[in-house]
């Protein structure tokens, strides 16, 4: 079985988030009722090493993982990584109460082809008991998750190639839920609040809507910070690396803000609004209580206010580390600016304390 949920006694694991343009690594500890950031690092990936969430260049990804391990100076070897929700099929199934894990595994393996549209030899499956089945006596509700082996294997290969040990392969949506539980405490949101997390990465934007802390809707679309970088390259004739730096550090001509940056921010707001419309039209909801912006783009100055003002919904930028202590060896300023992009890495590192 896959270990998507990692049914084993908790060991300390590094959270390793492999996105389309970067590898992010995070190590947490927990003492005296408080989490502490022990080490972290972010490294960029070679172009096209990961395409739309699939590892395309195993060696390129391995090298980037080696870089973050060296930068972070972590001593840990065990890793929790994740696959994108779009590559995982999940189904809730009822099963007889009182079955042992082994019996469940046998029965699910026999019945899995009813639920999964791929040949069974091509998929890895895992399951987790959710609790008693509502309205059905002597039955439990079981979450079955299946993912194509090649999706997992390319990630496993990249991790092993960097001399780390892949202990847990999670799903990004579940990692996001775990990190959200930290953010929710800071925002004083009710348990039952409906919250939209908009994770804007370099090439992908993922909307996750959570109610009662559980994901009830996700949607991925191709849109991200790379569009801004591409526009800087096109307009000012800069190579990729310089454009990326200028975007972060400034030094672009005066027309950059009004002509490039502001229209990009407006485009972000439109993407958020459109994603939410898709959610509203496919559910009985017609509003959300709070919007949380995550991902590298979200810390862009003024974006939080713009989303709040245009959509009329309380909005904040994710910082999973706000209530954590930080080791003296960690650059707290850098961590603060990377924080919104570290949600998935954080949710994965939290697997240490299952």
Language model segments and positions:
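Gly/Thr-rich phosphate-binding beta-strand-loop-beta motif of the actin/hexokinase/Hsp70
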Residues: 2-44, 77-82, 186-217, 224-227, ...
């Amino acid at each position: 079985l896959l270990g998507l949920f990692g049914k084993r006694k908790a060991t300390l694991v590094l959270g390793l988030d492999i996105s389309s343009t970067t590898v992010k690594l995070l190590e947490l500890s927990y003492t005296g009722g408080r989490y502490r950031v022990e080490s972290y690092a972010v490294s960029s990936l070679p172009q096209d090493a990961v395409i739309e969430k699939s590892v395309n260049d195993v060696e390129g990804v391995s090298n980037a993982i080696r870089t973050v391990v060296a930068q972070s100076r972590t001593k840990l070897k065990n890793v929790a990584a994740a696959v994108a929700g779009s590559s995982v099929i999940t189904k809730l199934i009822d099963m007889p109460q009182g079955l042992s894990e082994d019996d469940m595994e046998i029965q699910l393996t026999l019945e899995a082809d009813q639920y999964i549209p791929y040949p069974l030899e091509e998929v890895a499956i895992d399951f987790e008991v959710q609790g008693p089945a509502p309205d059905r006596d002597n039955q439990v509700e079981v979450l079955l998750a299946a993912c194509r082996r090649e999706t997992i294997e390319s990630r496993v290969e990249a991790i092993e190639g960097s001399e780390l040990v892949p202990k847990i392969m999670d799903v990004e949506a579940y990692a996001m839920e775990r990190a959200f539980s930290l953010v929710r405490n800071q925002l004083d949101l009710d348990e039952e609040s409906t919250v939209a997390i908009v994770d804007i990465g370099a090439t992908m934007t993922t909307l996750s809507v959570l109610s009662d802390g559980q994901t009830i809707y996700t949607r991925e679309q191709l849109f991200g910070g790379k569009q801004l970088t591409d526009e800087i390259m096109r307009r000012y004739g800069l190579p990729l690396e310089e454009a990326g730096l200028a975007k972060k550090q400034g030094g672009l001509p005066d027309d950059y803000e009004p002509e490039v940056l502001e229209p990009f921010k407006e485009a972000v707001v439109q993407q958020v609004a459109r994603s939410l419309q898709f959610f509203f039209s496919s559910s009985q909801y017609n509003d959300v209580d709070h919007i949380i912006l995550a991902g590298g783009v979200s810390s862009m100055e003024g974006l939080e206010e713009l989303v709040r003002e245009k959509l009329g919904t309380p909005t904040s930028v994710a910082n999973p580390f706000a209530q954590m202590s930080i080791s003296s060896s960690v650059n707290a300023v850098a961590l603060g600016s990377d924080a919104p992009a570290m949600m998935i890495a954080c949710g994965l590192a939290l697997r240490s304390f299952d």
